[in-house]
Amino acid sequence: MHYKKIVKGTFIDRPNRFIAHVEINGLIETVHVKNTGRCKELLIPGCTVVMEDFRKRLGFESRKTQFDLIAVYKKTDKDEILINMDSQLPNKVVLEWLEQFPPQEAYDFIKPEYTYGNSRVDFYMEKKTSVGIKKYLMEVKGCTLEQNGIGYFPDAPTERGVKHLHELAAACKKGYKCFLAFVIQIPGVTQVLPNKKTHPEFAHALEMAKAAGVEILYLQCNVKEDEVVII
């Protein structure tokens, strides 16, 4: 996924879930935060943040804010790492990834935002086989929380996430092949563990889903200021 135009600034504060104040080229700007999660470990006053710039872009003249905050530089013991925190990115990069499978592995049909039962699942896929059509369901979660080189999910309680795991587990029993895909929006992180301290119910539901046959995918990303791709 590519961002058309980016600009960097210095994070000041976050009055609510939706906006932040950022200093850009000496001016204090109100920007839209593309992640309604807490992100307290990332958005620290004084840190460098990356925004997509919509100024003078055709079709976006009526926007209330001219910038989307999409990424942040997090200081570590050795250096800084760039973490993409755009909550809309995971599904977009997964769709790009699915559509680029080699022919021998490609799905014959991919449907984003698929209605399954009383819920929406991120992706429904099909493959034609010698014995019929194989059906797949995939739920996608973005990981932006890192501690000591390990990713954790969620960064805040997610009853919706627990519900999704129960639905995938039930779908496995009906013959679907089901995946939970963690899109790791942090360079160098290869695994994601359940954040038991923040939401023990999610950790329990994850174990139950795995026992039911849900396959867990850890999708590492190449993270740049203006682009993120699954590697």
List the predicted regions and their residue ranges.
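Beta-strand/loop nucleic-acid-binding surfaces
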Residues: 27-42
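Acidic-basic catalytic patches of nuclease active cores, encompassing PD-(D/E)XK
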Residues: 40, 79-112
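Domain-level recognition of nuclease-like catalytic cores that cleave nucleotide substrates
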Residues: 185-231
